[in-house]
């Protein structure tokens, strides 16, 4: 139905209209619902008057026509990697962003265009950018109503050299004589072959101007593909930049022309060194009143640190091909080889990255666990005290605590992450028939507990107790607020969710090993991670996520989440 609105007054009444505001950097919207199909109009065509919230429209518009001037930003933005060909640019790959809300607002809508295409071109080797905007028709300004200024909106997100004309950009890429000799900045740290294609991983300090220039060009990918991701500030003091290391993944391709580069970007990651205080307990502290000495200059790389992965991205055309595991393994190897690094951590990982990380760490630690015959002791008590009710979990009698601590510190894995991998391995050592996934009799286990006749049933019982113990310590502040019965129920539910997630990964690992045995292929532990465990936005492994988090929700939390959540974080 076409409505012509001319100097129309609407009274904000529950019977007449319901008004809801949504905020957006590109413009706010007022959503009207008054018995007719919902209409969406920009707030710039309405003005509010008085306490009665009367809306006064100053122009005539066909509302149905007006809605045709908005488009989905995710569909409008098109990212293209290009290489020089004989006469024109050759498209290597083209894809759309996963998110655009940091740039165009929470609604991810752009007003004022029909047939809009925002094409972001990047040279495949050095990411030289170019912004090109095309459309079929643009909204003509009516008073203060105008189409979104796209170049102005994108200016804070892309380098200045992206605002060149398409002919100038094509000429610059086609005539780039330096492309033939291009090498990624930094040093080569890892090479590998995947699906008969060659790849390299390069690492360099952010204090290097070439690394910084390449990262500046890639920064917009953070906002387009990493949920709640924040671009790095590359204008910090040099001593801060020295704490950052950037890893670039490149594919070695056949150059389309003699002057073209053989490198094509696949993804990148950034790591940051956090200072770690390690108290020297071998010496007794002594107070000295001597003047403060002016010692030699200390470089950040010489200080004890925790290495934290801040950003980790494989571009969509290369996801689900195993590049994420190779990149993570390269970072972990550098961490182990650096004597100043205490452990490797990850900044706010999503569940997709958790899958990749669990897969990589499991295959790194599994040979070490097997070597030392790590398993749960089914009889932690003496024979005469087995019938007594235990007052606490005998952790030291169940697993070799000192040995596991030494393994963790030697591989520099975060304590929480190490606990996940250990639980997964210990679960794999229990026969499937004695686990819940294999049809174990849980009722009998709850009755028999550690007094069960089968040692594997006792191992499974103690595995659940060890996992509950870790979950309770981690979520103690939440659990102590619950009644005892509800506390026990929440722990049981969470342990079952954790076990279910482990079973998914263990099944995937087992199937992969069977395929490799059938093909007669022997791979190194770091290379046996599933190719599907990339940190991308989609894939089989992300459809069956590892369930780790312990949450307690009430009705108010659910209502608030439904009202405020734009999208589910992954």
From Swiss-Prot:
Region feature (Disordered): 522-570
GO terms of biological process kind: DNA repair; subtelomeric heterochromatin formation
Residue span of region Interaction with histone H4 N-terminus: 106-108, 272-274
Record GO terms (molecular function): histone H4 acetyltransferase activity
Record's keyword annotation contains Transport: no
EC category name: transferase
Substrates-to-products reaction catalysed: L-lysyl-[protein] + acetyl-CoA = N(6)-acetyl-L-lysyl-[protein] + CoA + H(+)
Residues noted as binding acetyl-CoA in the record, renumbered to the chain: 312-314, 319-325
GO cellular component terms, semicolon-separated: chromosome, telomeric region; cytoplasm; nucleus
Site (Interaction with histone H4 N-terminus): 244
Subunit structure: Component of the HAT-B complex composed of at least hat1 and hat2. The HAT-B complex binds to histone H4 tail.
Function, in words: Catalytic component of the histone acetylase B (HAT-B) complex. Acetylates 'Lys-12' of histone H4 which is required for telomeric silencing. Has intrinsic substrate specificity that modifies lysine in recognition sequence GXGKXG. Involved in DNA double-strand break repair.
Name used for this protein in its record: Histone acetyltransferase type B catalytic subunit
Organism: Aspergillus fumigatus (strain ATCC MYA-4609 / CBS 101355 / FGSC A1100 / Af293) (Neosartorya fumigata)
